[in-house]
UniProtKB/Swiss-Prot annotation:
Residues 92-239 are annotated as: Coil 2. The lineage of its organism: Eukaryota, Metazoa, Ecdysozoa, Nematoda, Chromadorea. Residues 74-91 are annotated as: Linker 12. This is Muscle cell intermediate filament protein AV71. GO terms for cellular component: intermediate filament; nuclear envelope; nuclear lamina. GO terms for molecular function: structural constituent of cytoskeleton. Keywords: Coiled coil, Intermediate filament. Residues 272-389 form the LTD domain. Belongs to the intermediate filament family. One of its GO terms (biological process) is protein localization to nuclear envelope. Gene3D superfamilies: 1.20.5.170, Lamin Tail domain, Single helix bin, Vasodilator-stimulated phosphoprotein. Residues 240-394 are annotated as: Tail. It comes from the Eukaryota.
Amino acid sequence: AEINLVRRRVNNLEEEVTRIKKDNLYLVNELNKARSDLDQETLNRIDFQNQLQTLLEEIDFMRRVHDQEITELQAMAARDTTPENREYFKNELSSAIRDIRAEYDQICNINRTDMESWYKLKVQEIQTQSTRQNLEQGYAKEEVKRLRVQLSELRGKLADLEGRNSLLEKQTQELNYQLEDDQRSYEAALNDRDAQIRKMREECQALMMELQMLLDTKQTLDAEIAIYRKMLEGEENRAGLRQLVEQVVKTHSLTEIGETESIRVLKGETASRTSFQRSAKGNVSIQDAASDGKYILSENTHRSKEEPIGEWRLKRKIDGKREIVYTFPTNFVLKPGKSVKIWARGQGVYSPPDQLVFDAEDSFGIGSNVQTILFNKEGEERASHIQRSSHTIN
């Protein structure tokens, strides 16, 4: 802001110098005009002097003519012998001569007075104008000198301010570089933190899955124990042998976390009965399909053979109505003894080849009768996972 103010002042001073130069040029032109007028008046004075000389010569000539006429008249009067006539003509001639001389003297005096007055007036006007122009020119020179000094000071100050501005700009640039470095460091730290968080979440998810598998195993074992106990007690018929692979999960109506108990159900509780049936025609099987629709887990059970399952399709049908289809990426290979989890959109992290994400759906669907079937590229069924659930209230 201070630099802009100084620049504006410099511009104003330069405009003032330009204006004063214009005024000085105008005054110089006026002085030259006055000098030209003086020269013209001098020429006029010389012309008038010449005219005066001509008039004086004419007067002298007329005087000589008149003198000659007077001489002739005197001669004529001298020839007149009458004293009265001579005296009369002499008196008349003297009177005429006086009148003529008085008239010419008056004319000469008037012309001389007029010429002297006119020339004095013109000379005084020229002197006054010249003095005024000299004063104005002197003032303009002093003003130009003062403005030059002020302009020099402002230029020096402007140079100092520009130096300071350059230094500040350099410091600003260095600070910007430092800020960019700090931002990159901060982003790198954030990325590291996010990577650690993702890793911890994945580990937590793996632990949760392992815990869920243990709970499922425990529930299955508890159910089998309960079935055997009932069979031993005679409370179940022999058809119960088909339920060895069934999972019995009892859930209180006010509790979100499932609890595993025996098949006995108390009054006022909700019992949920879920059975799973899995089959596979080869090494690739559907190991698990989340009942909440979050993921589907496929596994290569062979310990040494890779299974190329690129473009294979997982078809999931919910309650015989809605159908969801997921296609594996082209050239996807499932390693021996490895599994791949396909997450619904927003439910897990994309980390191939162990974890994939189905971007088309945010859930694989929830229902009481859910069939998940794996087809190869030729449309042949290679594996299936069937889930059936029933709920009773006592």
